[in-house]
């Protein structure tokens, strides 16, 4: 069915409602039966309409348009005579559905476990409200209102609508979390610049070293949250300036010890060298496939490598990397964990050679994981199913640094 209606002066655009609905159901993983139940439309009729087409009542079309976020007002004038005398109500359920699927990437939220796989619409609303502490799902629009530059750039940064929804969800959670943590320490750039020079030494303590660095940074006015990878975002890290203080997100995407430190130092580079630009653009996201045009990612990567192992020492790595006892000796001499040597060596190779060398040195005996390092500082609202609880746990952890 195409919605088409001519009046004396206006011809309304042909819109294949059936095709739009098919795409919507497929992209969001919604069963026809669930949509039919929620909209109060006979399931067999809706299935037949989607597969074969045919006539559909105007009131039913309006419900579907609301779910698809098609403005019904565009068509109401042309169909106003059809509206008169109809006894079928257009309920709020279609509006609820439209809100949910226009604001949230439901399939991704199911994938990360925030929403149960077979949850119905009411259950989806309840689970999202429980996560945020909402009384009503519509509170999402006024929750953690992002600064104008932050919001406009987030919509510009991710062009696909599906990614944009997950990206905004991610940003809202983080922005709200940083605001609630509310680091009381003033940002001390000079001390940060000096401290960064010594961060490599903390890598030798694979259990408490990373935690100690995070707490020192907090005292310097830099708040760092370390999170598991959130499906649908593809972000290695991010830096925001909130209330005049740097706020950093490190994503434990690869679960590799050396990557954790490289990601942290990468973001600290931007704080030290791009602070004024960060204030103007509101935030910076580090991602492999979409480099930031405002900031120099190559310089940040080089800085991170140099802060862990200086260039002159890195030049010696190809000669010793095959001999584990030499790697251990070098690690002790330059005060880093052996895993850092293997990791930095691999990161410095071109992609073709890196793949071959990774097969030799990518095992857990060379590249250790991050589980021990981030145990006490992991920020995992998704795992806890509760954003407020995750924030409170981090606030308690940061209190130990004051």
What is each of the regions a protein language model found here?
Residues 2-263, 268-402:
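Active-site hotspot residues in diverse enzymes, especially metal/ion-binding acidic/histidine motifs
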């Amino acid at each position: 069915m195409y919605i088409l209606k001519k009046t004396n002066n206006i011809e309304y655009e042909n819109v294949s409602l059936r095709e739009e609905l098919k795409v919507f159901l497929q992209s969001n993983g919604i069963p026809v039966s669930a949509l039919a139940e929620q909209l109060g439309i006979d399931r067999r009729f809706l299935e037949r309409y989607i597969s074969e087409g045919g006539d559909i009542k105007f009131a039913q079309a309006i419900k579907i348009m609301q779910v698809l976020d098609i403005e019904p007002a565009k068509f109401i004038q042309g169909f106003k005579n059809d509206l008169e005398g109809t006894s079928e109500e257009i309920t709020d359920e279609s509006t609820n559905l439209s809100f949910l699927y226009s604001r949230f990437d439901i399939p991704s939220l199911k994938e990360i476990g925030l929403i149960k796989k077979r949850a119905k619409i009411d259950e989806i609303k309840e689970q999202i409200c429980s996560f945020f502490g909402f009384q009503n799902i519509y509170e999402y629009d006024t929750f953690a209102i992002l600064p104008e530059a932050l919001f406009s750039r987030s919509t510009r940064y991710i062009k696909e609508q599906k990614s944009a929804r997950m990206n905004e969800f991610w940003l809202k959670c983080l922005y709200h979390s940083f605001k609630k943590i509310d680091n009381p320490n003033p940002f001390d750039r000079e001390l940060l610049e000096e401290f960064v020079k010594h961060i490599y030494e903390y890598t030798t303590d694979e259990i408490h070293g990373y935690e100690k660095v995070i707490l020192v940074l907090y005292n310097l006015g830099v708040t760092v949250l370390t999170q598991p990878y959130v499906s649908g975002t593809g972000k290695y890290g991010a830096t925001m300036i909130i209330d005049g203080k740097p706020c950093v997100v490190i994503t434990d995407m690869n679960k590799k010890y050396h990557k954790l430190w490289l990601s942290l130092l990468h973001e600290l580079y931007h704080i030290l060298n791009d602070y004024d630009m960060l204030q103007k653009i509101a935030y910076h996201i580090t991602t492999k496939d979409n480099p930031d045009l405002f900031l120099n990612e190559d310089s940040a990567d080089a800085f991170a490598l140099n802060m862990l192992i200086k260039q002159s020492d890195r030049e010696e790595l190809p000669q010793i990397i095959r001999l584990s006892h030499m790697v251990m000796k070098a690690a002790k001499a330059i005060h880093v964990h052996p895993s850092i040597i293997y990791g930095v060596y691999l990161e410095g190779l071109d992609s073709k050679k890196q793949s071959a060398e990774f097969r030799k040195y990518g095992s857990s005996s060379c590249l250790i994981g991050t589980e021990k390092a981030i145990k006490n500082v992991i920020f995992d609202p998704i795992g806890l199913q509760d954003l407020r609880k995750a924030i409170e746990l981090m606030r308690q952890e940061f209190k130990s640094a004051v």
